[in-house]
Amino acid sequence: MRKTEITVQVFDKLLDIEKGLAKNGYHKKEEYCLRDHYFTKFENAKIGDYKTLLASSILIRTIEEDEKCTHCMIYKNKKLDQNGNVSSEEKIRVKIDDEQNCINILRSAGLNNWCNLKNDNIVYVDKSGFEIDLQLVDGLGIFIEAEEDQSIRELSEKQKFDYLKNKITSFGFCLGKDYSCKKPYMILQNKKTRQ
């Protein structure tokens, strides 16, 4: 099922963000770590645009929570609006037993591992059940991600996007301008800049 979500970079200190969320009625629900390995058929991922690159990518994800690891292979089918913002996405996911063997298979098949992403996630929830995912991304900084819940399912994608954006901006944090941050692509762009 397609879901609308926003992801925006936050430039406040972690402690200030956590205090701001608590002040707005949010409490910590869970913590976990994601390790993502993105693979594509393109030999040089740096030459493609984001939509083409992601449409050709498979990712191997490891989720570490409470000293347990689960692994899966994911394909993200993202729908972009005319401005290149992600208006919705659908994830196709299958569990795998062994992250490293799966990575080795993809490499042996000639796929290019164009991005490795690690982020620590802290999920906050308010009394209505609305969740905010605070993400501490290695090499990039702090992000907030929020996705639609049952209360806005019947709205259009644009209305959902605007609702989520307004919800996040209401906290008063120092936010980036892009509410559709593409973290893997940001890492790729950072690699380009350093070369």
Feature annotation, model-predicted:
Residues M1-S128, F173-Q195:
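N-terminal strand-loop-strand beta-hairpin
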Residues N112-Q150, E154:
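Conserved, surface-exposed functional patches that form binding/active-site neighborhoods
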Residues S151-K183:
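Mixed-charge, glycine-accented linear interaction segment located at domain edges/termini
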Residues I17, E67, F143, R153-E157:
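Intrinsically disordered, low-complexity acidic/polar segments
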